[in-house]
Regions:
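Short, glycine/acidic-enriched loop or turn micro-motifs at the edges of active sites
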Residues: 46, 89, 176-178, 196, ...
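An alpha-helical support segment within catalytic cores of ATP-dependent transferases
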Residues: 2-13, 121-174, 184, 271, ...
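Glycine-rich, phosphate-binding/catalytic loops in enzymes
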Residues: 59, 101-102, 190, 207-209, ...
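Conserved N-terminal boundary motif of the eukaryotic protein kinase catalytic domain
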Residues: 13-21
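Conserved strand-to-helix beginnings and helix N-cap segments that scaffold or border functional pockets
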Residues: 52-56, 203, 222
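ATP-binding pocket architecture of kinase catalytic cores
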Residues: 20-128, 149-150
Length: 290
């Protein structure tokens, strides 16, 4: 069905092609158009997907940095949105660590830090959203009936460490990390999947990289996160507090909990587990916080 729809809307302009489904860093239905020159990627989503509208606005804003694929065209059908974008070379960053290529992973984490500081967080909020979400921390609702009361109470206490100030906001990716990048042999980094991007404090992205690494790769987390933060601070000398970083991680987990409030019970239970883990775990127990 998808191939039929895509050929109907794309064949006349881009020529004949076959579809190759892409995984590793791409979400939704994402395909390589095999046979086009130059190679193209299309992302296919439900027409009423607000996350995709947010992503498109973000990609248009950040296009000149070179850290994202270029958008060539947006096609809307009765039921779908089809985004035609540039194909970028590279392998999924997470697969490098999964294959135990530790030295290359170290270089990747340095690149993650430098790119985040120089090419993403360098875009400051100027009190105009440009169609990109704005952080809602100051109006955040912790009332979800499937979350245990003691976790709500603990979260409220931790979130008091945050003093959210729009003057500190920058463009944030929202789910930044090795799982959402492509990385080449020449150390070129492409950042994918900007659906969760928002204007927010830069600590949301910094904390989330460390959170993801500690959750999934605890044996490597401290050394890799230290490399990431060192490189970030070389390019953006920012004050980092373990307490505030953890608070922003709790905020991020709550944002996901709101996204899964209609999801199956096992999905909700997994994110409740992650909230408890975030509250109890010393994620930022390495040096270089000042």
């Amino acid at each position: 069905m998808t191939e039929k729809v895509l050929k109907k809307h794309l064949k006349e302009k881009y020529g004949d092609f076959s579809l190759v489904r892409l995984t590793g860093g791409y979400t939704n239905d994402t395909f390589l158009l095999n046979g086009t020159l130059p190679p193209l990627v299309v992302k296919v989503t439900n027409k009423f997907n607000e996350d995709i509208e947010n992503e498109i606005n973000c990609l248009n804003l950040i296009q000149e940095t070179g850290v994202t694929p270029k958008i060539y065209e947006l096609i809307e059908t009765d039921a779908l949105q089809i985004i035609v974008m540039e194909y970028r070379k590279g392998i999924n960053g997470q697969s490098i660590l999964d294959n135990n290529e530790l030295e290359r992973t170290k270089e990747l984490y340095k690149n993650l830090g430098a790119s985040l500081a120089k090419r993403i967080h360098s875009i400051k909020y100027n009190y105009t959203s440009s169609g990109i979400r704005e952080c809602t921390f100051n109006e955040f609702n912790l009332s979800l009936d499937f979350v245990p009361e003691f976790l709500i109470a603990n979260s409220m206490e931790i979130l008091q460490n945050i003093n959210d100030n729009k003057e500190e906001w920058v463009l944030t990716h929202g789910d930044y990390g090795i799982h959402n990048v492509l990385y080449t042999d020449t150390n070129t980094l492409t950042v994918l999947d900007w659906e969760w991007s928002e204007w927010a404090n830069p600590l949301t992205d910094i904390g989330w990289v460390c959170w993801f690494t500690k959750l999934h790769y605890p044996e490597y987390a401290d050394s890799l996160n230290l490399l990431f933060i060192k490189e970030y601070k070389i390019n953006n000398p920012i004050h980092l507090s373990p307490e505030v970083l953890r608070s922003y991680c709790v905020y991020k987990v709550w944002k996901v909990l709101h996204k899964v409030k209609k999801a199956p019970q096992e999905v909700q239970e997994e994110w409740i587990r992650r909230l408890k883990w975030t509250i109890e775990t010393d994620i930022f127990n390495f040096v270089l916080m000042n």
